[in-house]
Amino acid sequence: ASAEGGIYKFLSDNLFGLLKADPKCTVFIRAALNCANASIEKVKPAMERLSDIASDKFVVGEENFVESPAGHQLLKKIIIQDKIRHSEGGHTFSKMLLDQLNAKNSLESYIGCNRGAFLLVTIMETGVPSLQQLVKDCLKQYGKALGAQSTRGAELLVQKLNLHK
């Protein structure tokens, strides 16, 4: 357990650099953040750091974390695990991410790109009612922007929002 604290502190302190250094680092990051045996209090700072990085505004089509294959897969796999985290009473990455997206007014970046919209669909598919409601609440003001998108991710997101009214 003593190594656990050091590993997660290293991860929190160096997450951005690891993500930039090599996309393959996402495999380690995903394993660390989704580790069933890790203390949530040790994992939480790294999840908060990842949500901070993932919630930065970006221009669709330009190099960014959300649209990169490795970044998208990392976020998707961590969001999927939120169903388990929630059932165990832990902090969910999805809530951290949505809170950051709201605080930074960067939800439009997610809505405007296929992979970003798919990540919001993935949050809806966790089956966690509080997360589903949070997505709906966050997206209320973006109805027109979402409706104007022609990506498959945006289409599915509109369907999910209508299914969960």
Segments the model singles out, each with a brief description of its role:
Residues A1-K165:
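Eukaryotic gene-expression regulator signature that favors modular helical reader/repeat domains
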